Regions:
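Glycine-rich phosphate-binding loop and adjoining helix at the ATP-binding site
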Residues: 99-104, 108-120, 124-190
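Canonical helix-turn-helix DNA-binding module
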Residues: 33-44, 60-63
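Extreme N-terminal segment that seeds HTH/winged-HTH DNA-binding domains in transcriptional regulators
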Residues: 1-30
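Short beta-strand(s) of the beta-wing in winged-helix/HTH DNA-binding folds
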Residues: 23, 52-53, 58
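Gly/Thr-rich phosphate-binding beta-strand-loop-beta motif of the actin/hexokinase/Hsp70
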Residues: 63-102
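Basic amphipathic alpha-helical segments that dock to polyanions
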Residues: 16, 27, 38-51
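Conserved phosphate-binding catalytic cores of ATP/NTP-utilizing and phosphoryl-transfer enzymes
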Residues: 56, 60-76, 180-190
Length: 190
């Protein structure tokens, strides 16, 4: 399977993100799909709000105007949190990583419960100010993290075996992952 094992839907989304709006025919050609398979692939993405159909465009020759498919940048909002020894940095982004709003607060209390509560508070404040509730939260920090959930060791915060993602998820009601900051940066740049 080409596409690195990704589903057809994921490949379609990535194509629209990287190449911009295109017709169903162009998308199908790019992915090597028949017209019927292209339609079956994009229909659930349109229904989920991940892809939007743009108004028809005149093609300049015979035939019907062509509707373009485009990635819907407002389809999701993600909260990103960066913890340092003395500050908490928070942003809300669209799925492409475009920062919508951000804030930075001093980290005066470093026990895990206080930090989880501060994260929940700042995420709620950013959501209120932007009018966009995040769909998920990602936290990065200079620490050993396992399973994208548990901070094994964060010396600068005095933490050992802290289930940070679960704590923040419980405080916010949102899915949450945690990652080592260098790994998170490398993943974002990949």
């Amino acid at each position: 399977m080409d596409g690195g094992g990704r589903s057809l839907g994921a490949r379609a989304l990535l194509s629209l993100i990287s190449a911009g709006p295109m017709s169903r025919g162009d998308l199908g050609e790019r992915l090597g799909l028949s017209p019927a398979t292209t339609t079956r692939t994009v229909r659930p993405l349109i229904e989920a709000g991940l892809i939007e159909e743009q108004p028809p465009v005149e093609v300049g020759g015979p035939g019907r105007p062509t509707s373009l498919l485009a990635f819907a940048p407002n389809s999701a909002t993600v909260a990103g949190i960066k913890l340092t020894a003395d500050r908490l940095y928070a942003v809300l982004t669209d799925p492409l990583g475009e920062v919508l709003i951000g804030d930075s607060l001093p980290l005066t209390e470093t026990d895990a419960g206080s930090v989880a509560a501060l994260i929940a508070s700042v995420v709620a404040q950013l959501a209120e100010r932007s009018g966009r509730r995040p769909d998920a939260i990602g936290i990065s920090l200079g620490a050993a993290v396992v399973g994208r959930r548990t901070v094994v060791v964060a010396s600068f915060l005095g933490w050992r075996d802290v289930p940070l993602a679960a704590m923040v998820s419980e405080a916010t009601g949102l899915p949450c992952v945690a990652a080592n900051d260098v790994r998170a940066f490398a993943h974002a740049e990949a």
